[in-house]
Regions:
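Flanking helices and flexible, charged tails adjoining ferredoxin-like Fe-S electron-transfer domains
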Residues: 1-21, 90, 94-102, 141-217
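Rossmann-like nucleotide/phosphate-binding core characteristic of flavoprotein oxidoreductases
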Residues: 11, 20-22, 28-30, 81
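Glycine- and other small-residue-rich loops at beta-strand/loop junctions that grip anionic moieties
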Residues: 20, 41-42, 66
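Ferredoxin-like iron-sulfur electron-transfer modules
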Residues: 25-37, 60-61, 65-68, 89-116, ...
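Iron-sulfur (Fe-S) cluster-binding segments and ferredoxin-like electron-carrier domains
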Residues: 31-32, 45-81, 160-164
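Cys/His-coordinated zinc-binding microdomains
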Residues: 41-44, 53-56, 118-121, 125-128, ...
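Short coil/turn segments at secondary-structure boundaries
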Residues: 42-47, 90-91
């Protein structure tokens, strides 16, 4: 089994990657490696890039739906599948002339307007936002994936987006591996919270809701 699939977070158990043959696992891992790991859900898979990669291979889902990856990622996946290139799902962000992908973005919180509600913290798939109740929150720009999942959670609209220089191609694999690891760490942390019977808290995120559903099934 590819190393990426060793001891995956519980949320991914339903993918049943461990019962697939090695060739299938390898293809899923290769497609997942091509995806930008923003975990944005714009492909239709709210639980991240790996479920999308799995759906492409096992269920024949369209391989051109990664919005932040743009045409380069759509073409890379087409090559892995030995299929023709398809136009990438369009992005609202302009195409960067250097990377040929949609412009990379990051989020920033306007501190003077933040009310410290903590809702954006639970929405972040890579734990890039820190803060406590009634205190100003901060986003670590180097960790932010630009997924925009924090925006709709903010009751006072104090989160802005701004473009950044594209990640150099040589640095992209390491960046994506780091984002994947952070997302998996986030899932495991939420899993521990869900399983903490003594300090049970209300469900506050999509991930927690899905984990609760998994426990019931």
């Amino acid at each position: 089994m590819p190393v990426e699939f060793d001891r995956l977070p519980v949320l991914f158990a339903r993918l049943q990657l461990n019962v697939q043959d090695i060739a299938t696992q390898t293809q899923i891992a290769a497609i997942d490696a091509a995806l930008p790991q923003t975990q944005c859900g714009l492909c239709g898979h709210a639980d991240g890039c790996l479920p999308y990669a799995t759906a492409i291979v096992l269920h024949g889902e369209p391989y051109n739906q990664c919005v932040p990856g743009g045409q380069p990622v759509a073409d890379a996946i087409a090559a892995l599948l030995n299929k023709p290139n398809l136009p990438a799902k369009p992005s609202k962000w302009a195409t960067d002339p250097v990377s040929d992908r949609p412009s990379e973005i990051r989020a920033i919180i306007r501190g003077d307007d933040c009310i410290g509600c903590t809702k954006c913290i639970t929405a972040c798939p890579v734990d890039a936002i820190i803060g406590s109740g009634k205190q100003m929150h901060t986003i670590f720009a180097d960790w932010c994936t630009g997924c925009e999942l924090c925006l709709p959670t903010c009751p006072v609209d104090c989160i802005d987006l701004y473009p950044v220089a594209p990640t150099p191609a040589a640095e992209r694999p390491a960046q994506q591996a780091d984002l994947r690891a952070r997302y998996h760490a986030h899932l495991r942390r939420v899993e521990r919270q869900v399983n903490d019977q003594q300090n049970a808290q209300p469900v506050v995120s999509m991930v927690q809701a899905k984990l609760n559903d998994s426990k019931v099934q």
